[in-house]
Amino acid sequence: MKNRLLILSLLVSVPAFAWQPQTGDIIFQISRSSQSKAIQLATHTDYSHTGMLVIRNKKPYVFEAVGPVKYTPLKQWIAHGEKGKYVVRRVEGGLSVEQQQKLAQTAKRYLGKPYDFSFSWSDDRQYCSEVVWKVYQNALGMRVGEQQKLKEFDLSSPQVQAKLKERYGKNIPLEETVVSPQAVFDAPQLTTVAKEWPLFSW
């Protein structure tokens, strides 16, 4: 009887801790792209790709820059990552409905933009952490992560050097302003709300 009561109490308490996706949540994963390892080495982090959650028709999508900027169903996005691993960060204290609406509306400006393989700080093309950063900045005036210069990253490894040569040849733009997935992850306004969560209700 005691065991049954314990099991019931655990089942009742689980929903209080379950992650409920909200527009504005920022999700991170290890990408399977050809540049993923170079990003990890240059930024000294596990996470090489990020996107922002947007709830559309009551279903969660990840707004991401990969190919063109687009919405990807959340479960599909997670499946694309290395071993299905992911971490979700949210503005501490949560976002108001109005703030979530502003983020969703601002995100639409970037839909269809081509991927920025040169990591330049312009609005013509976008890479993953750049578009998340710009949506937050333009919608809420919030800087989720510190901008850096390309030269501030660890560019010493052979994998990073090879990718730089592939993208830029001999003219590496060391003074280019960039924002990395790790910089977004480390934004002090954010707190972790989910990590490799195994159960989905959508």
Swiss-Prot record:
Transmembrane segments: none annotated. The keyword Transferase does not apply. Keywords: Signal. Disulfide bonds: none annotated. Residues 1-18 form the signal peptide. It holds the Pfam family Peptidase_C92. InterPro entries: Papain-like_cys_pep_sf, Peptidase_C92. SUPFAM superfamilies: Cysteine proteinases. To E.coli YebB. This is Uncharacterized protein YiiX. It comes from Escherichia coli (strain K12). The lineage of its organism: Bacteria, Pseudomonadati, Pseudomonadota, Gammaproteobacteria, Enterobacterales.
